[in-house]
């Protein structure tokens, strides 16, 4: 269960993987995009996981209809704004919303820098209107190669004062981290944090690479760390965060069952692991479900769930004073 007197964070939440089905329908109609179905009920199976997918790439294909309807920058702004409202409705106090501007721009050849500006505008408006805290993480989608990632990074860095970190996501097997060393040097030189999707489709070596070569202080998913005792020790000793996404890992067939998910063992090992959603609209879940259903099914005790919630605050890309303010606000709820 969620401890209401502590801040609730979601640090691994894809803005472009959380586009409402109703919004997809409306934008599809507006921009003349031929969708596979034209009602909420019939479109849902195309944009939401119905049963576990055989691979990460198959899972990611469910996101494609959401970005296919982003016909102009106002559509990107709308989706960003709605993401903040969705976080509020999920009882989240602080969200880090990540997005790939190249992926969002691709279908309708939007200017990548314009997409970043629109998302920044939408999230800032949402924070103003809905009263929760949110920050942005820019994603380089390695699926599209190193040149596209440089274009993406240039766009992200053009708004670096409104972005807290840069991530590397996408095809972990086909585009290993060693191709992006120079990209992340630019990220660190710009003073931004680094989080990397690793140890999801590829093995522990991908996580070592993210930490040593790319400068990651947090790892997205990281489930394969369980196969490397030295890595487990390193993560605990150096306080490298693991952004765990229980239902997502089940739906991508990264784990066979929640009962075999390594999150419980990460926490027992003293690793700073926290609970997150990933792509809530695609998964058909929200953060309370992860705490109240998925985490107990993964074998976590109530104390471990509470620890994971605390870890989320510790790992947040926030200043100490911002974290203290969130703690004080949550404490008033009792």
From Swiss-Prot:
Pfam families associated with the record: A_deaminase
Cofactors required: Zn(2+)
Swiss-Prot/TrEMBL keywords: Hydrolase, Metal-binding, Nucleotide metabolism, Zinc
EC number: 3.5.4.4
Binding site for Zn(2+): 12, 14, 197, 278
CC cofactor note: Binds 1 zinc ion per subunit.
InterPro entries, per database record: A_deaminase (IPR028893), A_deaminase_dom (IPR001365), Ado/ade_deaminase (IPR006330), Metal_Hydrolase (IPR032466)
Entry's Gene Ontology cellular component terms: cytosol
Main enzyme class: hydrolase
Binding positions (substrate): 14, 16, 170, 279
Function noted in UniProt: Catalyzes the hydrolytic deamination of adenosine and 2-deoxyadenosine.
Name used for this protein in its record: Adenosine deaminase
